[in-house]
Amino acid sequence: MDNLIKQLQMSVSSENVDRNFIEKCIEMNPCRRMLHEVLLERKDILRSRMNLVALYDTDEQSSEIEEILAQFENPTFPLEEVNTEKDEEWQPLERKYLDGINRIKEDTIMKQIQLDKDMEKALTNSEEVLRNHRDFRPIDEKDFSNIRQSISKRFEHSKNNIRGEAATKILVLRREIEQQGRKRRNFDKNTTDILQNWFHDHRQNPYPSDQEKAELAKQCNIKISQVNNWFGNQRIRTKQQALRMQEDERERAASMANEAQAIQNSLNSSTVASSSNMSTSGLINIPLVNPTMQSMVIPAVQPGLLGNPNAFLHQPHYFTAGGQMSLNDNGNGQQFFTDYETFGLAQSDTESFNQMGYLG
């Protein structure tokens, strides 16, 4: 066994050794079969410890990176154009951006092509190594599959790194273009004041003529195209501000109406609740008709009363006779005072009644 191990070490470490001679010696060695069985057992142990899920699992590409790399096929200028007329100052920036995108794209494609070539070379070499090892140790098809999968995964990870680097370069390029464009678009305070004063003085019709544009450009030491862009942007900003103010006013009016309705509903609920509580507690549970006063209803006038004075004496009393009602109670629980002996209009005798002069 020791002799066999030494021969294996010689075949691995030495480059000038006669390979055919070593292979023949190993094949004829009586311990070769025993070594083969030991290697198979060792191989099974190693396979049981391998994480085959991680080996065959592939890295998912980031959706954000793919969205950024879409600039390769459909590049979009970072600076938004608010006017149909393109600013002359932006044209060099746009060319710079497109050239930068093309350079990043070409560099990424070249790196991916080189990775593909290296992966094919690595796969070929690894398969050749396994075929050579087959003469000394047990090799099956699963070994070829595992090594191909391992190499492919490593190179796929490298490709994802290259795409991530390309996305980072695109973001840096866009940020540079945005900063340069912002510097070109921002005027100094004096230029801004001149343009804003003209816009404010002509706010009813903020559209300068060609002559006025040329004069403003001369005063501000800028180009006419920049004057056009500034007024276009200013008109849009003013319109958007007016729309926002109208929307805020509508929301404020709606909020005030809702608050007023809520207050009114609260007052109505309070009134109904108070009335319900008063009715329940008996505070307004007062009878409309006093039973004691029901006997005081004036009866209908009898026929012949007006034609015969004496007939009036025979009419029933309008009110209850004296002594039948307490002088300190009018039937409703209230105290009263009277100069008459009784509470009735009709007197107890005819002479007293005539003295009152009711009939003239």
Curated annotation (Swiss-Prot):
Location of the PBC domain: 1-179
DNA-binding region: 180-242
Highest taxon above the source species: Eukaryota
Any matching Pfam family: Homeobox_KN
One of the GO BP terms on file: dopaminergic neuron differentiation
Keywords: DNA-binding, Homeobox, Nucleus, Transcription, Transcription regulation
InterPro entries linked: HD, Homeobox_CS, Homeodomain-like_sf, KN_HD, PBX_PBC_dom, TALE_homeobox
Subcellular location: Nucleus
Assembly: Forms a heterodimer with homeobox unc-62. Interacts with pqm-1.
Designated name of the protein: Homeobox protein ceh-60
Gene from which the chain derives: ceh-60
